[in-house]
Amino acid sequence: NDLTAYIHERMPLTATLGIKCAKMTPEEIVLTLDWSETLCTGSGILHGGAIMALADSAGGAAAFANLPEGASGTSTIESKTNFLGAVREGTVTATAKPLHVGGSTIVIETEIRNKAGKLVGKVTQTQTVLRPRP
């Protein structure tokens, strides 16, 4: 879809991982990632790094969708992840929502849910607002 193509263009890692975009508004970004053996630990659990990449991508998209006027982009400057459950199959969904939108930082909270809708991770991150250099 067009949203997925847009996300892949802005963040090429999302294409490499196979992340898809289901929704993109300033209020909410929804990205999905399918479980794959190539994204797992040796025991078949979706790797925490893959989950964090999904969450960081969702958070970055949410920050970008809320950029103040005159800003050129964002960059993650802080991220905290709580893993609450293992993912052994199916699709995981990241839903990112802004908690604070300011002129210099944007704070995003992202929930990661498994295919049954169970919360398996929660991420809070701060994005710095980038401005063009004179």
Regions found by a protein language model. Give the residues of each.
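Terminal targeting signals and extreme-terminal segments of soluble enzymes
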Residues: 1-134
